[in-house]
Curated annotation (Swiss-Prot):
This is Photosystem II protein D1 2. NCBIfam families: psbA (TIGR01151). The gene is psbA2. Tyr-160 forms a radical intermediate that is referred to as redox-active TyrZ, YZ or Y-Z. C-terminally processed by CtpA; processing is essential to allow assembly of the oxygen-evolving complex and thus photosynthetic growth. Fe cation binds at residues 214, 271. Its EC number is 1.10.3.9. Photosystem II (PSII) is a light-driven water:plastoquinone oxidoreductase that uses light energy to abstract electrons from H(2)O, generating O(2) and a proton gradient subsequently used for ATP formation. It consists of a core antenna complex that captures photons, and an electron transfer chain that converts photonic excitation into a charge separation. The D1/D2 (PsbA/PsbD) reaction center heterodimer binds P680, the primary electron donor of PSII as well as several subsequent electron acceptors. It comes from Parasynechococcus marenigrum (strain WH8102). It catalyses: 2 a plastoquinone + 4 hnu + 2 H2O = 2 a plastoquinol + O2. It is a multi-pass membrane protein. Its main location: membrane. Keywords: Calcium, Chlorophyll, Chromophore, Electron transport, Herbicide resistance, Iron, Magnesium, Manganese, Membrane, Metal-binding, Oxidoreductase, Photosynthesis, Photosystem II, Thylakoid, Transmembrane, Transmembrane helix, Transport. Chlorophyll a ChlzD1 binds at residue 117.
Length: 358
């Protein structure tokens, strides 16, 4: 009987595999990292160059380019990588699809390059979180929590352009461009009146409130291990077994401040709640944007209250609607003469009754 004895030397491939999956590396790479690193590098490099030096982009497809880069007069606030042209629509537009580099830049090709590599990169980052958790024997909830901001990015950069029929409707990659996207989104979809957006607001603001409450309660109930002249931070040693704060004192304080059952007496359920609240809220916002992408918009309570003579009694819903019409009139002002709401429905009278003539 013969036994095959394997050589003690590792092949280059085996050494590479071991290095990629080694959890003792200062920064864990992982197989998802092999995809993440080049994609995020490509997105970052292209974004930086485009933000600084990209020529104007014909975003509306009407031969009226919009400048977004710094060398064309923008600053950090007003600058952006302008979305690809409405003439391109939803077509995949890599460099080799254009007749020249100038054409690719004019039609906003860098926007697609940045967005696609960025979305692949952050998706791989989520996979890398799961991969590292798996190799360390941890539970997988870190990548589940990260899926909330990932879903938000997918909604505004991918799902919304798909629903609207053009990548020109995607969110510009800049500060003022983000605000413009938000204003136009409200004008066209009434997002403030959508229940899923309301849940997202509750998730973000509630998460901030709960985070501040938890941090302040813990900091206020630390077990003193130092003198009055030393920082309390020196009383904690990394990896210590005993609790660093008195959860009973924190529970008693908060239970008396509000009422008993508003305070958690279980540290594990408390931290699950702190993680789940904002994550679920942002999930709902992403679902809301994804449904509004296909024009399933927020509630419409316009002119819903009438007096005894049939005249409109305005509500805040009417004020929001009026503001939305104003924003819709101003955006893409050269692409169409009137916003769709004004062009396709019965006109809103500017006076309650016609003046008598003669």
């Amino acid at each position: 009987m013969s036994t095959a004895i394997r050589s003690g030397r590792q092949s280059n491939w085996e050494a590479f595999c071991q290095w990629v999956t080694d959890t003792n590396n200062r920064i864990y790479v992982g197989w998802f990292g092999v995809l993440m690193i080049p994609c995020l590098l490509a997105a970052t490099i292209c974004f930086t160059i485009a933000f600084i030096a990209a020529p104007p982009v014909d975003i509306d497809g009407i031969r009226e380019p919009v400048a977004g880069s710094l060398i064309y007069g923008n600053n950090i606030i007003s600058g952006a990588v302008v979305p690809s042209s409405n003439a391109i629509g939803l077509h995949f537009y890599p460099i080799w699809e254009a007749a020249s580099l100038d054409e690719w830049l004019y039609n906003g090709g860098p926007y697609q390059l940045v967005c696609f590599h960025f979305l692949i990169g952050i998706s791989a980052y989520m996979g890398r979180q799961w991969e590292l958790s798996y190799r360390l024997g941890m539970r997988p909830w870190i990548c589940v929590a990260y899926s909330a901001p990932l879903s938000a990015a997918m909604a505004v950069f991918l799902v919304y352009p798909f629903g609207q029929g053009s990548f020109s409707d995607g969110m510009p990659l800049g500060i003022s461009g983000t605000f413009n996207f938000m204003l136009v989104f409200q004008a066209e979809h009434n997002i403030l009146m959508h229940p899923f957006h309301m849940l997202g607001v509750a998730g973000v603001f509630g998460g901030s409130l709960f985070s501040a409450m938890h941090g302040s309660l813990v900091t206020s109930s630390l077990v003193r291990e130092t003198t009055e002249t030393e920082s309390q931070n020196y009383g904690y040693k990394f990896g210590q077994e005993e609790e660093t704060y008195n959860i009973v004192a924190a529970h008693g304080y908060f239970g008396r401040l509000i009422f008993q059952y508003a305070s958690f007496n279980n540290s594990r359920s408390l931290h699950f709640f702190l993680g789940a609240w904002p994550v679920v809220g942002i999930w709902f916002t992403s679902m809301g944007v994804s449904t509004m992408a296909f024009n399933l918009n927020g509630f419409n309570f316009n002119q819903s209250i009438l007096d005894g003579q049939g005249r409109v009694v305005n509500t805040w819903a009417d004020m929001v609607n009026r503001a939305g019409l104003g924003m819709e009139v101003m955006h893409e002002r050269n692409a169409h003469n009137f916003p769709l709401d004004l062009a396709t429905v019965e006109s809103t009278p500017v006076a309650l009754q016609a003046p008598a003539i003669g």
